[in-house]
């Protein structure tokens, strides 16, 4: 920016940024972690909706059992896994620590525990498929145990990352709370 009188006016050459305030690191981290958790929640909702669709088709007998198998037992309690995701979303607007803690605890109960049970429930069928090449449940021509193990592995990864980011977000919120109490 040049002035009519001659050289550039003082402070307009871009060297005046050092006195400006910066956003605290825990606020930047909070925004980033909220965004990552929201992405994971949306991926979880897609998995959840696919599971609901599969269960609905199986129970309502819209297709024959040769195409869509009846649901495994672990799929019923996993339907409650949408509750931790909703609690997590509710905790974001006002940085509500208690909702985030409830979300993390209920994620273990409603998301991780059914997935662990599901891996144990489907293991004999997977073992039989691996050893003898026989499958008794099918999803559109594919072995149901293979497809459901893929879904299970994806869901475990989504929930593990969601727990990891939630813990980091909780630490970030505690940092900002402790700084406010010191002042």
Curated annotation (Swiss-Prot):
Membrane-side (Lumenal) residue stretches:
61-71, 118-137
Give the stretches traversing the membrane. 40-60, 72-92, 97-117, 138-158
Question: Ribosomal protein: is it a keyword of this entry?
Answer: no
Q: Which residues form a coiled coil?
A: none
Domain of life per record: Eukaryota
Q: Which GO biological-process labels does this protein carry?
A: defense response to fungus; endoplasmic reticulum organization; granulocyte colony-stimulating factor signaling pathway; insulin metabolic process; insulin secretion; neutrophil differentiation; neutrophil mediated immunity; neutrophil migration
Cite the entry's keywords alphabetically.
Answer: Endoplasmic reticulum, Immunity, Membrane, Phosphoprotein, Protein transport, Transmembrane, Transmembrane helix, Transport
Pull the Cytoplasmic topological domain ranges from the record.
1-39, 93-96, 159-183
Q: Does the keyword Signal apply?
A: no
First-listed, main subcellular location of the protein, grouped into a coarse class:
endoplasmic reticulum
Functional description taken from the UniProt entry: Endoplasmic reticulum transmembrane protein involved in vesicle-mediated transport, which is required for neutrophil function. Required for vesicle-mediated transport; it is however unclear whether it is involved in early secretory pathway or intracellular protein transport.
Q: Which family does it belong to?
A: Belongs to the jagunal family.
What is this protein's name?
A: Protein jagunal homolog 1
What is the organism field in this record?
A: Bos taurus
Lineage, please?
Eukaryota, Metazoa, Chordata, Craniata, Vertebrata
């Amino acid at each position: 920016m040049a002035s009519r009188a001659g050289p550039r006016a003082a402070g307009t050459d871009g060297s005046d940024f050092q006195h400006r305030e910066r956003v605290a690191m825990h606020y930047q981290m909070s925004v980033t972690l909220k965004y990552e958790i929201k992405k994971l929640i949306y991926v979880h909702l897609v998995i959840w909706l696919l599971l609901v669709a599969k269960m609905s088709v199986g129970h309502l007998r819209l297709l024959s059992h040769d195409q869509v198998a009846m649901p495994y037992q672990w799929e019923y309690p996993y339907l409650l896994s949408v509750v931790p995701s909703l609690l997590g979303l509710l905790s974001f607007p006002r940085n509500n620590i208690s909702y985030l803690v409830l979300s993390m605890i209920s994620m273990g109960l409603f998301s991780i525990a059914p997935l662990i049970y599901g891996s144990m429930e489907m293991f004999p069928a997977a073992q039989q498929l691996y050893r003898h090449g026989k499958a008794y449940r099918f999803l559109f021509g594919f072995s149901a145990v293979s497809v459901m193990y893929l879904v299970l592995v994806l869901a475990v990864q989504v929930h593990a990352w969601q727990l990891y980011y939630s813990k980091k977000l909780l630490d970030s919120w505690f940092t900002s709370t402790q700084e406010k109490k010191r002042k």
